Amino acid sequence: MTLAAPIAVYVLAALAEIAGCFAFWAWLRLGKSPLWLVPGMVSLAVFAWLLTRVDADFAGRAYAAYGGIYVTASLGWLWLTEGQVPTRWDILGGGLCVLGAMVILAGPRAA
C-alpha cells in the first residue's frame, strides 16, 4: 500500500479546511468583509468532499489520520501565511501528530 495518495489528499484537504476557517477568522477577528465567507464556505465544502476521496473503510479512521496532517499544515499556515515562526514545541508537537497519522495509515488491518 502506498501512502502517497492518501497523504496528498489529506494535504489538499488541510489546505482547504484551513483556508475556509481562516475566512471566518478574517471576518470575525480581523474585521474583514462578510464576503470572505463565500469562498470560505466553498473551501470548507471542498475539504469535506476531499476527505471522502480517501480509501478508508471507516470515516473515523480517515479523520484520525487526517488530524496529524492538519496539525502540521496549520503550523505551515502559521509560518507562511501569518508570518509567525513555529516554536520548537510547535514543531515537536506537529512531528508527533504526523507520526501518529502514519501509524494509523500504515497499521495492519484484520481481513
From Swiss-Prot:
Keywords: Cell inner membrane, Cell membrane, Membrane, Transmembrane, Transmembrane helix. The chain crosses the membrane at residues 7-27, 30-50, 62-82, 91-111. It is found in: Cell inner membrane. It holds the Pfam family UPF0060. This is UPF0060 membrane protein Pden_1837. It is a multi-pass membrane protein. Belongs to the UPF0060 family. SUPFAM superfamilies: Multidrug resistance efflux transporter EmrE (SSF103481). GO terms for cellular component: plasma membrane. It comes from the Bacteria.
